[in-house]
Amino acid sequence: MKKNRLDTLLVEQGYFADADEALRAVLAHEVKVNDVYATSAAVRVAPDAEVVVRNRKRFVSRGGHKLQGALDAFGQDVRGLRCLDIGSSTGGFSDCLLQAGAASVACVDVNYGQLAWKLRQDPRVSVFERVNIKLADPVELGAPFDVLVADLSFIGLAALAPVFARLSQSGTVFIGLVKPQFESRPDETERGVVRDEAVRRRTVDEVRAALADAGFDATGVVESPITGPEGNVEYLVRAVFEGSRVDGGCGEGGRS
C-alpha cells in the first residue's frame, strides 16, 4: 500500500486548504496519526491510517461521514465523474464527493443559503437553490449525471424513484440515504424514531423495490456509520440505472 506525505494526505482529506496550513497544524501538535502526535509533515503515512486533527472537521457536515462510509463499503470510485447532490443542504455529501475526486457536483435544495461557503465558491460546484427536484428541468440541472446522491427529509426516497430515473442514463450510480422515519407510517414512529428493526428493514426493501420499478438495479445496502437525529438508524442504498434516457429527459424507468 503506497504511503503519502502527511501534509498531502491532510489536504486530500479536506482538513486543510494547502500543505503550509497542514504544516502549521503539525508543528502546533494538532495532528495525531494512529493516536500519536505527528512531529513532521513530511512523514509517510498509509492511506488507511487513523488521522485525527484537533478542532477540525473533515467534512462541512456529518453527512459527509455517512456518504464516505457508503463509498468505502461499496468500493465506489467517483473520480472524474459528474455528480448531482439532491437535498444538498450544508453540503456534506458534496464535500465528500469532491474530496473523493468528483469532476463536478450540482447541488440542489429547496432551501436557500445553507450550502457551506467553501463549496459555494468551489468552481466544480453548481448551486441550484429554492429548487424542488420533483419540478426541476433535468436539462437545466445538467442531466444526465454519472452519480446521483440523495439525503432528504420529510419525503421518502421511494416516492422520488421516477425522478431519479429522469436524471439518469444507463450506468448512472445512485446512492441514497434511507431514513426510515420518513419512509414509514406515523404510527410506526415513537417521537420521530423508528425503534422496530423489522420496520426499518421493510422501509429499505420498499425503497429498493421502488428503485427497481423505476429502472434501477439495487445492488447493495449498508447501515450508516453514524445515526441520524434522535438516534435514528439510517441506511445507504446503492443502485445502478439500467434504462436509457429518451425524449423529454426521462429514463425508461421513469415512465408510468
Question: Each PLM stretch: what is its role?
Answer:
Residues 1-47:
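A basic, amphipathic helix-loop patch mediating RNA/tRNA/ribosome contacts
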Residues 62-81:
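Conserved alpha-helix/loop element of class I SAM-dependent methyltransferases that forms part
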Residues 79-89:
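Conserved class I S-adenosyl-L-methionine
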Residues 90-101:
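Conserved SAM-binding loop of SAM-dependent methyltransferases across substrates and taxa
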Residues 158-175:
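A short glycine-rich, Lys/Arg-flanked "PGG" loop and its adjoining helix->strand segment in the class I
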Residues 226-250, 255:
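Core SAM-dependent methyltransferase catalytic element
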